[in-house]
Design a protein with these regions (language model features):
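Transmembrane-lumen/periplasm boundary regions of multi-pass, lipid-linked membrane glycan transferases
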Residues: 43, 51-56, 69-75, 79, ...
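Loop-to-helix entry region of an early transmembrane alpha helix in multi-pass inner-membrane enzymes
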Residues: 71, 75, 79, 87-110, ...
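Transmembrane-helix signature of polytopic, membrane-embedded enzymes
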Residues: 14-18, 91, 112-134, 305-317, ...
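Transmembrane-helix motifs of polytopic, lipid-linked glycan transferases
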Residues: 99-119, 157, 161, 295-298
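Membrane-interfacial loop-to-transmembrane alpha-helix junctions, especially the N-terminal start
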Residues: 13-16, 124, 207-208, 314-318, ...
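C-terminal luminal/periplasmic domains and tails of membrane-associated envelope-modifying transferases
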Residues: 259-269, 543-654
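Short helix- or helix-capping micro-motifs
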Residues: 128-133, 140, 160, 326, ...
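Hydrophobic/aromatic-rich transmembrane helices and adjacent perimembrane loops
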Residues: 141, 148-156, 329-341, 423-432, ...
């Protein structure tokens, strides 16, 4: 009779479960409050077109900006939004998108907690998780951002699962004890001993066979890297086939495939061969050494164990999960290869030489997932992915509003990210990051056992920051492109939180301190809703002080509130002009309203919606009056203008 309450009590004793349950309830409660971003409709259409490619449609390949990023998450939120709309018809599909984004944010919250446990005890870990989950910047983006929020979620999930896989493989593989470099040298000595022992135990015939195979593989690599004999041989054979002078089997095969070969010049076939050779050359350069290792391990007993060539390593489920998440992360943004690098470093640190084979599986599976979920790559995967990486590294500069002026993202000052992080996180979070940095350095000075974990945190934040400062990595719209670094900063804040909790002797003092830490964020969530992502802290005077100095509602989600006001007051069939993206208004506008953009003259409109960050204008001279402002404090996000009625003509003199 008391089984269910007892289970509920046990469940409630897990703070992260309570946090996630509360988060899910909040997502259901608030999921249909948010406006659409200006690129949400375009990305939803791209996801729908990508889904159709699996049934043979070519629509996706006719869209623009395909090298920017893959559509895996766009496909996912298309599916979930339609399912949510069918379950709750009052929610338009745009609200289904926002609910899906919130689930990705909850995944981030869970993974943040799991990662925090590596740096602090359970109590400060879940307290730090509350601090993370109630950051208005993250909470707001968790509902509206269809690129940076899922990227952050997949990034941290890939890292957490990859580190878990490395720990499991460490326990199974039993690498040499000791610190990293001495243990690595010991593994190398073991490998050399296996090779000497195995070689001496081989018969002369097997030695010759092994040496011949390895020599052949080495010559093939040398040819691919430098000589180019295979490339020239292929061109000669193709030319002979084209002339009809090839050996009969090859000639018959070619004739059966290319029945009208004479209609195509030889140069066209040679160009296709060149493209094919370029496509397979790079994979072969990675594959041939692996084949050599596998062959040598089959001949030399024990060698395979030194580099992880073992079934127990290949059967680790967390490794495959992390590989899937890596592939999905790269598909969302090419920068996802960075998390693969972090996981690889940790796997090497934990298992040393035994990491080689698991890493081959990890990267191969991740590449397969990226390829399978990014149709743009299908015609020429390696070349197109490298082009996409280059495009991302040289992403065109955008204008961003910073410190009261517009500037190119390429010439933003070096302190662009640190300053925005300091004013977009809550005051307690900023203070705790500073305290946590000092506490982490103090810990490392006293005990270097966890230096590698702290080093990963430093790389997580430091590498993107270096990309901004030294390599002109594009960032605009405040720090939304760097949201994925904030979990690392807030883990440092958690370290600071733990350092303070250790000095509090009373449980009530701990709870009071936690309330002081969390309440600024919670209050901002309530006051700013549904525009939490515009949050600025008191260092710049809140959103009122930041207005006119920093970007606030760049995504113009406040257009929803304005069009809903029009829905209530406008007559049937009036014309509404949207200064911005009409797609952000369409899901919420009355069906009878005629929507136009600013390519039409103002005289065509009865109402005008103006989102301030991109169009600060005065429509009074055009015969309009302001009747509604979407605002928080002194910050005006969107203006609603209505055409003034025409003055009556003066009556004629009798």
């Amino acid at each position: 009779m008391f089984e269910l309450p007892q289970r509920a009590l046990e469940w409630s004793r897990s703070p992260i479960r309570v946090i996630l349950l509360v988060g899910l309830i909040v997502a259901i409660w608030l999921g249909n409050d948010y406006g659409a971003t200006f690129d949400e409709g375009r990305n939803a259409n791209k996801g729908a077109a990508a889904l159709r490619t699996y049934s043979g449609s070519k629509d996706y390949f006719e869209l623009d900006a395909l090298p920017d990023h893959g559509p895996i998450y766009f496909m996912f939120f298309n599916i979930t939004a339609k399912a949510i709309h069918s379950l709750a018809p009052s929610w338009p599909e745009a609200d289904g998108h926002h609910f899906t984004h919130s689930l990705m944010f909850l995944l981030t919250v869970y993974c943040f907690y799991r990662l925090s446990l590596r740096f602090m005890g359970p109590r400060p870990a879940w307290m730090a998780t509350i601090l993370f989950a109630t950051q208005p910047l993250l909470f707001g983006n968790g509902f509206i951002n269809q690129k940076d929020t899922p990227f952050m979620a997949l990034f941290i999930a890939a890292l957490v699962s990859g580190m878990a896989a490395a720990d499991r493989l460490h326990r199974r593989g039993q690498p040499s004890p000791g610190t990293f470099l001495p243990a690595l040298l010991n593994d190398l000595r073991d490998a050399a001993a296996y090779i000497r022992t195995g070689w001496s135990g081989l018969s002369r015939r097997r030695r010759a066979l092994l040496a011949g195979i390895l020599l052949l593989l080495g010559l093939l690599m040398l040819d691919l890297l430098w000589i180019g004999l295979l490339r020239g041989l292929g061109e000669s054979v193709l030319a002979a086939i084209y002339r009809g002078a090839a050996p009969p089997p090859l000639q018959r095969l070619f004739d059966s495939v290319a029945t009208d070969a004479y209609k195509t010049p030889l140069e066209a076939y040679l160009a296709k061969y060149e493209a094919f050779y370029t496509e397979v050359r790079l994979p072969l350069l990675f594959l041939l050494p692996l084949v050599g290792l596998v062959v040598a391990s089959r001949f030399l007993p024990g060698l395979g164990q030194t580099w992880g060539f073992d079934r127990i390593f290949a059967a680790e489920p967390m490794l495959w999960m992390s590989a899937f998440l890596l592939g999905a992360t790269v598909c969302v943004r090419q920068l996802g290869v960075f998390v693969g690098g972090l996981v690889s470093l940790y796997l090497l640190y934990r298992t040393r030489l035994k990491a080689i084979f698991p890493l081959v599986l990890y990267w191969a599976a991740g590449a397969a997932v990226t390829y399978a979920t990014w149709p743009y790559l299908w015609p020429n995967p390696i070349r197109r992915f490298l082009e996409s990486l280059f495009f991302a590294a040289q992403f065109p500069p955008h204008h961003t509003f910073f410190e009261g002026r517009w500037m190119s993202s390429r010439i933003a000052p070096w302190y662009y990210f640190p300053k925005l992080a300091a004013i977009e996180l809550t005051e307690p979070a900023v203070l705790l990051v500073l305290i946590g940095t000092a506490a982490a350095l103090w810990r490392l000075r006293r005990d270097r056992a966890n230096w590698f974990l702290y080093g990963l945190l430093a790389l997580w934040v430091g590498v993107p920051f270096a990309g901004l400062v030294f390599f002109d990595m594009t960032a605009y719209g405040n720090i939304r492109h760097l949201l994925f670094t904030l979990p690392a900063l807030l883990i440092v804040a958690g370290i600071g939180l733990e350092a303070i909790l250790q000095r509090l002797r009373r449980r009530w003092a701990e709870w009071l301190f936690m309330a002081v830490v969390a309440l600024p964020g919670i209050w901002a969530l309530i006051w700013l809703h549904p525009y939490e992502y515009i949050y600025m802290n008191s260092l710049v005077g809140g959103v009122s002080g930041a207005y006119g100095r920093y970007e606030l509602d760049r995504q113009c989600i406040s257009l929803r509130e304005a069009i809903e006001e029009v829905n209530q007051i406008a007559a049937q069939g009036v014309t509404v002009m949207v200064l911005g993206q009409i797609s952000a208004v369409v899901p919420y506008a009355r069906p009878d309203l005629r929507l136009i953009d600013d390519r039409e003259p103002f005289r065509s409109a009865d109402y005008v919606l103006s989102c301030y960050w991109q169009s600060t204008i005065d429509l009074g001279p055009e015969g309009f009056e302001t009747i509604y402002k979407v605002r928080r404090g002194e910050a005006v996000l969107t203006d609603l203008w209505r055409r003034l009625p025409l003055a009556p003509l003066p009556s004629a003199e009798p």
